Amino acid sequence: MALLISCGEVTSSQFTVFRLLNQSLDFVSDNVSRLLAPIFTNLRDFEMRLSCIERPPSISGNHSHLCTEKWFSDQKDYDQKEDPEAIFNVLDYILKSSLDRLASLRESVCQTKSFDYDDCLSIHSSIMRDLCLQGKLDAALWLRKKMIYSGVIPGLITHNHLLNGLCKAGYIEKADGLVREMREMGPSPNCVSYNTLIKGLCSVNNVDKALYLFNTMNKYGIRPNRVTCNIIVHALCQKGVIGNNNKKLLEEILDSSQANAPLDIVICTILMDSCFKNGNVVQALEVWKEMSQKNVPADSVVYNVIIRGLCSSGNMVAAYGFMCDMVKRGVNPDVFTYNTLISALCKEGKFDEACDLHGTMQNGGVAPDQISYKVIIQGLCIHGDVNRANEFLLSMLKSSLLPEVLLWNVVIDGYGRYGDTSSALSVLNLMLSYGVKPNVYTNNALIHGYVKGGRLIDAWWVKNEMRSTKIHPDTTTYNLLLGAACTLGHLRLAFQLYDEMLRRGCQPDIITYTELVRGLCWKGRLKKAESLLSRIQATGITIDHVPFLILAKKYTRLQRPGEAYLVYKKWLATRNRGVSCPSILNHMHTEEQ
């Protein structure tokens, strides 16, 4: 047909038919890529990958388009002129266009495959990391399996994310299996991979396997670093393995990482902390001496570990000495340093020194925190110096540091224990003015103060106010009121409170029943007290010797030793481990004398 066209031996109608045929050929040529794709790449893999991404912009559709319109001349009047050279030119152009189109198609398929692989790897790896961070480890493992099945292996960073997620979730066996798979099919695990798995093994107390993995790292061409050693040493210290008798083990661990590396401050800190916790003060100070000899720079963390260890062992003089050495070396004490010393002084009852150190702390430019005030306020209240504790509470407010509700409760309870309910109410009102909401412990402290002063009506009023502020009374609330009612002889009121407890779903405890037994004995209703005691035993509540002792003492005072002895035998039947049995007989003997 091309020969006829070039010679001009066709009519216009035939020419139109030929044009339609060539347009059909163009349509077929546009779809050749779909027909030839299975030849250049695997059909299943190609379709799966191509569905993941859009067609790359670099691959244009006209690369494989056969420009047949150029085969025809624009000349319409051929005048029956024969031109054999034109025929060969047309055939040559057709062949060249077909070969160019075939080469372009092959290049397009190869580019599509390469683009799809890299893009899928990046997208799927990102999804896997997100799944690990969200804790969806099963989905991440499933995606990894699918990627490997399709010939795409996630990178090392993605595998490390997966290892970290598995270890944090406690799936240590899966993490161990993943490392083995990485060694077999890639990517090869690095030091971070091993550190993650070793830390996971140590977290589940499998230190033996962690040590084995640590020792086999060199076999796979991975040299442990300082992080690896820190993890191992910390785990061994927690287990109590590293001590005076096995210092050689520590040296082997350190030699495995970097033979010429200086002594690591983190390892030294871990060792000293472990020694102090195990009571090995001398060994801890030997580590410090070795640090000084090797010129290892000490920071505030190292000094805080030493000072805390010395304070725990009661060596306050040495603790002060290290604080002075700390300042000489240009390391400023921080809030943890002062809190450690203040806490130790309060435990020893040296509140004047603790308060002076608190002032030194402020003068030195270190702002006290909640713990600094909490230690002193609690210590002063326990020691009975509530007014001074209240001064520290006010000092917090002046420093724009709002005390937590616990500190308010401690001061209110301190005043309440000494019967100073007016001061307790003043602190409560100040607490409310600063927007701190009272809780059940606040009200219990106030009730305790009223009960201590014999003001049962005021205590009852506080209980009713609790319910109006949507604070539910607890067992302690009822025990305080019930005990006060029994002490004042209001036995009926005490049992009303007991019934209210049950209605409100508040479970009585041994203190509740002990107060009721005491009230019944005080009223002389001993048989009912014995009956209540039997009911207590039937409920299965853990019972101590106190209610038996109250009842036995009452029988002894009434010169009824036989019944007192029966109570003692009932106590023997309980076999309570908390108190020795002869204690009741000793009290009974004392009462008889």
UniProtKB/Swiss-Prot annotation:
Signal sequence coordinates: none
Domain of life of the source: Eukaryota
Mapped PPR repeat ranges: 120-154, 155-189, 190-224, 225-256, 264-298, 299-333, 334-368, 369-403, 404-438, 439-473, 474-508, 509-543
Pfam families in alphabetical order: PPR, PPR_1, PPR_2
InterPro entries, A to Z: Pentatricopeptide_rpt (IPR002885), TPR-like_helical_dom_sf (IPR011990)
Keywords, comma-separated and alphabetical: Repeat
Keyword Repeat included in the entry's annotation: yes
Similarity comment text for this entry: Belongs to the PPR family. P subfamily.
UniProt name for this protein: Pentatricopeptide repeat-containing protein At5g24830
Species this chain originates from: Arabidopsis thaliana
